[in-house]
A protein has these predicted regions:
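C-terminal catalytic histidine-bearing segment of alpha/beta-hydrolase fold enzymes
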Residues: 322-377
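N-terminal cap/lid segment of alpha/beta-hydrolase-fold proteins
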Residues: 72-120
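N-terminal pre-domain segments of enzymes
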Residues: 23-70, 369-377
Length: 377
């Protein structure tokens, strides 16, 4: 039977089946793809050239720093890095509990993972935990969910990893409980929690770069949930981050029915100063597509679940990410941006972890680490 005859027979069978089911087959015409428009288009409004973007980027960076209240950060103290304990894990890497100064009267604790068999200097990773009281312990694979044991996983892959406590978790849980920011705001009434943790995560990069084992030019950052959007903020803030991966980071400001969660009046308060505006229906002058675009042309991977939170808000995330890609294309670096959308909710499932780690390998290791080879026999 000729291909055209077979196609006609198949079409006839489909037609008879539709008629038998009482349905008339739809008439479908050829069409060109429509232009996709969204509110996220304002990212490049008035921008035609790379030079235009670079000028607009400076405006956005200023707005970002104002959102953080970065001018309220304290003077950075000397690190004075101390090692409190050191153990060898499976003959693969050394795990150290360390502390270092983040303010004149405040020290942060973190776990460091340093591979034992290094050939030359290694890339360094800042691994940020989610909202969990013992976050650095979870990142080290010592408690809770081993899916989130980034320090353990990546140290075995040849990375030097620092997993710091969030500033109201671990060794610095306030008397009121984990993630209570009241005392922080009493100490720094004009600063923001996001400004505080971003500043501290930048100091974690200082720690990595102070180590003989680390190549200071190959620094990455990754995290889940609170650590996910913490990664976005850090990569936008500190250009030493060459590769970033945000897993299930929080929702943005627009198209978010629960936007007040960014400025609660209790417990963990991200941005205290924007609460009056939010209650009046006014959003900050910068949103997440603009913050994420500040990372370009450096490598950025976003992973999210369509069923992680409000369904329509999560679908807006895809439109937002498509617009961020336009910036990477303008920067002639589309290979440095990617996003992965799944249906596994608020998780770091196996395939997500493999994608994150491969992303780091691609952008922080030499090409030989990821190249494929033909079979010779």
């Amino acid at each position: 039977m000729k291909p055209s005859s077979a196609l006609a027979v198949a079409f006839g069978i489909v037609l008879l089946t539709d008629l038998a089911l009482g349905e008339t087959p739809p008439e479908r015409k050829r069409s060109d793809p429509p232009v996709i428009q969204s509110s996220w288009d304002d990212l490049l409004e008035g921008v035609e050239t790379l030079e235009d973007w670079r000028k607009h980027r400076e405006v956005l960076k200023t707005r970002f720093l104002e959102l953080l209240r970065d001018d309220q950060k304290p003077e950075k103290p000397p690190l004075e890095l101390e090692v409190h304990e050191s153990v060898t894990v499976d003959g693969a890497y050394t795990r150290k509990l360390v502390s270092y100064n983040v303010e004149a009267d405040e020290r942060a604790h973190a776990y460091l993972g340093i591979p034992l068999k290094l050939e030359g200097k290694a890339p360094g990773i800042v691994a940020l935990h989610g909202t969990f009281p013992k976050g650095k312990e979870r990142a080290a694979g010592l408690v809770d969910n081993p899916d989130k044991a980034y320090l353990d996983h990546l140290s075995r892959r040849g990375y030097v990893v620092i997993a710091p406590d969030h500033f109201v978790a671990g060794h610095r849980i306030p008397p009121e409980g984990p993630y209570e920011t009241g005392r922080f705001h009493q100490k720094h009434p004009e600063w923001t929690a996001v400004g505080k943790f971003t500043y501290e995560h930048s100091i974690a990069i200082d720690v990595l770069q102070s180590l003989d084992e680390v190549d200071p030019e190959r620094i990455g950052a990754l995290g889940h949930s609170l650590g996910g959007h913490g990664t976005i903020f850090l990569a936008a803030y500190d250009e030493r981050v060459k590769a970033a991966a945000c897993n299930c980071g929080a929702s943005f400001f627009r198209h978010n029915p629960t936007v007040e969660a960014w400025a609660r009046d209790h417990w963990y308060v991200y941005f205290k100063h924007i609460r009056p505006g939010l209650l009046e229906g006014n959003l900050p002058p910068i949103d997440f597509h603009e913050i994420m675009a500040l990372i370009a042309p450096r490598a950025m991977l976003d992973l999210s679940g369509l069923n992680d939170g409000i369904p329509l808000t999560q679908r807006q995330r895809i439109l937002m990410l498509m617009k961020v890609m336009d910036v990477y294309e303008l920067e002639k670096a589309p290979q440095n941006f990617a996003f992965y959308v799944h249906g596994r909710g608020h998780s770091v499932a196996h395939e997500s972890r493999q994608l994150i780690y491969a992303w780091m390998d691609t952008h922080l290791k030499p090409p030989s680490a990821t190249e494929t080879r033909l079979v010779t026999e």
